[in-house]
Amino acid sequence: MKSQIVIFIALVMLGACSGPANSGITQQPTLADYQVGEKWVWKYKGVTTEGEVRSDGEETREIVSVNGVLGMTIGNDTIPVTDIVKPDESETPKYDWPLEVGKKWKYENNWTSQDGTTGNQSQDAEVLSYQEETVAAGTFMAYTIKYTGKTSNSRGYSANEEEVWLYAPAIKNFIKLTQNQGEFSYAEELIDYSKPK
């Protein structure tokens, strides 16, 4: 499950966005929106309905320079920022740019986990609001994006799921995620954000 979430969060990073214009519409950022030393830290926890803790920890991502090329560290990997800001050409993207309140679209994702299990997500997405939201890291203007649908895998698992992402354009990232999938609930919250002065 954790590997699915890591893949999913990496996809979210591929949809990072810049701040909304006066019109309330948010465009995707450019390479210039990131700087070396920018850092995000989240606390996450996943629990079954029976109380079994399946994941519990922290995740840190940071913008680094590798041979003069900007990258984002995600676990043991470093993803070039140029990949993060590259437009998603899919007809069923994670984010349908530009973002604005009331926008709806279909999101579909096929994936393969590290153990070879394949799976599929099919969700209806809607931007519900854009307002101040408070998490452990502070208060940010954020979009609330709700995804509802189904996930299944090659091992016979199938479940309805609902995900709510609070996405803060000013920091180009999500500040909170809550996910309910079958008998499993997962939550992730930003506990620290910093950038060079």
List the predicted regions and their residue ranges.
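Intrinsically disordered, low-complexity, charged/polar segments
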Residues: 80-101
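Hydrophobic alpha-helical context, especially transmembrane and signal-peptide helices
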Residues: 6-7, 28, 93, 128
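Sec-dependent N-terminal signal peptides
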Residues: 5-14
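Short Pro-Gly-centered flexible turn/kink motifs
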Residues: 105-107
